[in-house]
Amino acid sequence: MTATPAAQPRERRLVISGWAVTSPYGLGRRSFAEGLLDGTKATSAVDGGQWPVPYGEAGLIPGFDIKAVLGRKGTRSMDRATGIAVVTVGELLEDFGQGLAADPEKTGLVLGTSGSVQSIMDFTKDALTGEKPYLVDPARFPNTVMNCPTGQSAIRHTLKGPNVTVSGGSATGLLALNYASRLLRGGHANALLAGAAEEFSVQRARLERVADHGGAEADPLGEGAALFLLESGEAAREGGRRVLATVLGSRFRAFPESGRAGAALARCVAEVLADAGVGPEDVALVAPGTPPGQLGKQEESALEGIGGERIAVRPLVGDATAASAAFQLAAVLAHAGAQPALVDRLALVTALDRDGTVGATLLRLG
């Protein structure tokens, strides 16, 4: 009898092998990288006629029009958050999706979002003020559900693998990346698109304006999406994709009161470095969340002793809320692409959300 060779386990190392961004710099990762590396401020004066909001400036995607970008088919009732997500998923697949279509059941999407408060409020208003017998446009109801951008993106781009929506404020992008890592290690997919999206809207602006920002003035709001192709190093090589970064680990904690956010983040950072067997002095690049007020000061304190260049994204693109950490991760990849000396160096991305979540993700670049 001839013994059947045991199947070789797939490589467990998870890598980022592609990325796409829709941001206040415009469509595409090139415009994002150029604006970020030049230090160009992407926020600008708000057109009060189009956007009656209590903000003088914001980081809007320039000239973004869903029908102009995606066409009229299937977009009549699509809201802004969904449109941003669908566009960014399409860009990532177009540039890095070679071979993924061969097995769509093994390619999925993990998208972080805050949902669309504009869609929720508009639909509620229609339900209370609309004319009988219908009162509301039923085609717009899906926009009120948080997983609408994820589901619509998967349908439009034929992603039949795991379809997951996560939400965690400013830490959402890191939470999505971590969730996708768990799915891949559990054998639920061969490749996952992971990231986060956020929309600018009148209702979001009004809510954010009256929120607690740690005793500081609220930052201008931003919008956009950043998505990353996550897979094993082996799968990346088979697909002809270059490894842009290896995910070494993530850690998250909750803090019960705002004064303890810094201590919680410091523990996350210490743990993720220890798990990777590296020290604070080994970090070459840090992309902090830089929230306003006391949270920002606590983040600075938590990162004392961590080496490396700091990348501040929020002052350039505004407060992108759910997309914030995803933009920070995209900024790390943009810097790595422009600086060959960063290959095989470590990058740290951190996030603090005022609702009680902190997180840290460690990457090895190249």
How should each PLM-predicted stretch be described?
Residues 6-9, 100-103, 133-134, 146, ...:
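Solvent-exposed alpha-helices and their adjacent loops that cap or buttress functional pockets
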Residues 30-33, 118-133, 185, 207-216, ...:
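A glycine- and small-aliphatic-rich helix-loop capping segment at beta-alpha/alpha-beta transitions
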Residues 188-211, 215-217, 250-262, 287-300, ...:
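Acyl-CoA/ACP chain-elongation machinery
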Residues 72-90, 138-145, 163-175, 211-226, ...:
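Active-site pocket-shaping loop/turn-to-helix segments
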Residues 85-95, 146-149, 154-159, 163-195, ...:
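Active-site-proximal alpha-helical scaffold in enzymes
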Residues 20, 110-112, 167, 192-198, ...:
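Short beta-strand segments
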Residues 9, 13-17, 22, 30, ...:
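Condensing-enzyme catalytic core mediating Claisen C-C bond formation in acyl metabolism
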Residues 15-16, 37-152, 156-157, 163, ...:
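Conserved beta-ketoacyl condensing-enzyme motif
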